[in-house]
UniProtKB/Swiss-Prot annotation:
PANTHER family: GTPASE DER (PTHR43834:SF6). One of its GO terms (molecular function) is ribosome binding. HAMAP family: GTPase_Der. The keyword GTP-binding applies. The gene is der. GTPase that plays an essential role in the late steps of ribosome biogenesis. One of its GO terms (biological process) is ribosome biogenesis. Belongs to the TRAFAC class TrmE-Era-EngA-EngB-Septin-like GTPase superfamily. EngA (Der) GTPase family. Associates with the 50S ribosomal subunit. This is GTPase Der.
Length: 467
């Protein structure tokens, strides 16, 4: 099993910078003010023949109230999970009361702890470390996480007691299993839903919009099946986005939508649908992600309010009618378990593969049932269909004059293929291509000449394949 390293310290000492250095990613937000990392964030790293897992935590200041207290609790939970704690302090600002409070907790916890003095670049190391000796946590280790100085040698020593990679179990692979993106505008209950799905308080839940600033990736198993949950920062209306970190978080949210296999879009039944919900759903659709809708805070609503919400969804979310919908209470767990079958169906549909013969048969049956219209006195012909990709599924239809095919007929084909193939929870995209026969532009070409040209083309293709 991978050794687990927890990065602990007061806010803005460089924990997220070191996390990014150790995992070689930019998965943790990094900016020059405290409080950016509010939840436990997990990443994997490799050094030589050793693998490890790193937990980035929110800062502990020692006088937490409200949200800060929830962040501090997440840090303490990370300490319990870890094999090793890297207690980070700031060599530039020096020792303070919060550092001493954290050190007291670590001594009581008796977890293997390394005292790491960060931001020592440009400082005389002995002077920078001198006052931290009195914390009683052993030799302080100077590093500069932003530039990588002394980081490799530190981790090499930290991992020395642990066996090499061959003797470890395979490290948890964050790409293994269905990646579920939990998305929505701020304070609709995303983090509460994540915690309910996981069965533990892994993500900070607090009644303040925007408490999840990072996209938190959490691998887990349910009934022997692997998943990765991605809890994203809520997307706010653009005019409400002011702080640099908030803007960065929205970018992370949109990146998480692209990276997930299935997006659970959380809607707030109490506040109803707003424009930001529609914009975010439109982004999911344009990204081609499979989608499950979760209408949260459904419990306790009056029947009139429920009917009003259902009507609004039917009227305004017609463009996402491919998604299965559930009315849930993340806080109480009502109907949350029903999300998993929908997630699986959406994932399976998004990654389905069908033979050219089957797709062409469906196309021909659809054309027989309802022919394309005449364009300038000539009937649009649709000859064959094959699959052009997956996640989302793409069906390529060949014929003539396909550029003139009306949108209404394209919708008819989409609905027909979706019904016959039983595609649920994912967009189904079509590409229409017209024939490229060089004789098509020559009205005087005989059928024999056209057949001869086609045979010549097949011969060339066969020779090319033999090479």
């Amino acid at each position: 099993m991978n050794p687990v390293i927890a990065l602990v310290g007061r806010p803005n000492v460089g924990k997220s910078t070191l996390f990014n250095r150790l995992t070689r990613t930019r998965d943790a937000l990094v900016a020059d003010f405290p409080g950016l990392t509010r939840d436990r964030k997990y990443g994997n790293g490799v050094l030589g023949d050793k693998t490890y897992t790193v937990i980035d935590t929110g800062g502990i200041s020692g006088n937490e109230e409200g949200l800060d207290a929830a962040m501090a609790e997440q840090s303490l939970l990370a300490i319990d999970e870890a094999d090793i704690v890297l207690f980070m302090v700031d060599g530039r600002t020096g020792l303070n009361v919060a550092d001493e409070a954290i050190a007291n907790h670590l001594r009581v916890n008796q977890k293997k702890t390394w005292l790491v003095v960060n931001k020592t670049d440009g400082l005389e190391e002995h002077s920078a470390m001198a006052e931290f000796w009195r914390l009683g946590l052993g030799d302080p280790r100077p590093i500069a996480a932003a530039h990588g100085r002394n980081v490799t040698s530190l981790i090499d020593e930290v991992l020395a007691p642990f066996p090499p990679r061959e003797a470890n179990a395979a490290p948890p692979d964050l790409s293994n299993g269905i990646r579920i993106g939990v998305i929505g505008r701020p304070n609709v209950g995303k983090s509460t839903l994540v915690n309910r799905l996981l069965g533990e308080d892994r993500v900070v839940v607090y009644d303040e919009a925007g408490t999840t600033r990072d996209a938190i990736e959490i691998p887990f198993e349910r009934r022997g099946k692997p998943y990765v949950l991605v809890d994203t920062a809520g997307v706010r209306r653009r005019k409400n986005v002011s702080e640099a970190a908030e803007k960065f978080s929205i970018i992370k949210t949109l990146e998480a939508i692209k990276a997930c296999n299935v997006a659970i879009m959380v809607l707030d039944a109490r506040s109803g649908l707003v424009e930001q919900d529609l914009h975010l759903l439109d982004y999911v659709l344009s990204s081609g992600r499979a989608l499950v809708l979760a209408v949260n805070k459904w419990d306790g609503l009056e029947q009139e309010a429920k009917d009003k919400m259902r009507a609004a969804i039917k009227r305004r979310l017609g463009f996402a009618d491919y998604a299965e919908m559930h009315f849930i209470s993340a806080l109480h767990g009502t109907a949350v378990g029903d999300l998993y079958p929908s997630i699986t169906r959406a994932f399976d549909s998004a990654n389905s593969h069908w033979s050219t013969n089957r797709l062409t048969t469906i196309l021909q049956d659809a054309v027989s049932e309802h022919q394309p219209p005449l364009i300038h006195g000539r009937r649009i012909k649709l000859r064959m269909a094959h699959q052009g990709g997956s996640n989302p599924p793409i069906i390529v239809v060949h014929g003539n004059q396909t550029g003139s095919l009306p949108e209404a007929y394209k919708r008819y084909l989409t609905n027909t293929f979706r019904k016959v193939l039983k595609v649920r929870g994912t967009p189904l995209r079509f590409e229409f291509r017209s024939g490229k026969n060089p004789y098509d532009s020559n009205p005087d070409a005989s059928d024999r000449e056209k057949a001869k040209q086609r045979e010549l083309g097949r011969t060339r293709e066969a020779r090319k394949n033999r090479r």
